[in-house]
Amino acid sequence: MTLQARNLTLARGGAPILTDVSLTLAPGALVGLLGANGAGKSTLLAALAGELAPRSGQVFLGDADLATLSARQLARRRAVLPQKPSLSFDLGVSDVVGMGAYPFPELDPAAVRQLVRDALEQAGVTHLAQRRYPQLSGGEQQRVQFARVLAQCHAMHAPGQTRYLMLDEPISNLDPRHQMELLATARALAHEAGMGVLVIVHDINQAARWCDTLALLADGRLAALGPPADVLTPDHMRRVYGIEADVLAHPTLPGRLLVLAR
């Protein structure tokens, strides 16, 4: 079962944000969404998540139009990590991670506690479990929010049902080590757990290293879609980002690319 955007067009205040964009998120794949600032990446993710209604076009989860699904139904099938999660309450870290279980009231307290422990460990933030969320650094908060959506993903596990995870710039506040750890986890969720994972990143080389497929947006349109070798070309770098770049085989990662801006 795939999550599929078909010919999406979306505008705000009369200004086009997305124009005729089609994209498929399939189980077992990590898809990277690239583009310059203002290209429409976050808008496309929100439309795929069912949080924004397109002016035209549709998003399908299997055969179901997302517009026909309730917020609770969506939350039981896909988890979303927004670019800037808003949380103004003075909650403990474990309580924040436990919010991932909110769409699953059938879970008993013991099951929720286990979900929280597993998510904290998978996100590498077990040592923060007893801290208060507002006291954390920006990077620590980002990793705790990642643990929250991991808890949601684990809670939604059901035989024969594909799960989806959407991450909007999840590494923007992280140091290099934690960037790699988060993206490695995202790829493992796709390759090993069979989830469909979409991630927005600005670091082209991180996208080239971790993603199976790349979608390159430019001015609200899909400029390129395919494996990294087809998308990360000097011509695309010039047309989308306005930079001259050399695209080389990665010196230590077989089959991966390295993009060097001149």
UniProtKB/Swiss-Prot annotation:
It is found in: Cell inner membrane. Disulfide bonds: none annotated. It holds the Pfam family ABC_tran. SUPFAM superfamilies: P-loop containing nucleoside triphosphate hydrolases. Residues 3-244 form the ABC transporter domain. PROSITE patterns: ABC_TRANSPORTER_1, ABC_TRANSPORTER_2, HMUV. This is Hemin import ATP-binding protein HmuV. The lineage of its organism: Bacteria, Pseudomonadati, Pseudomonadota, Betaproteobacteria, Burkholderiales.
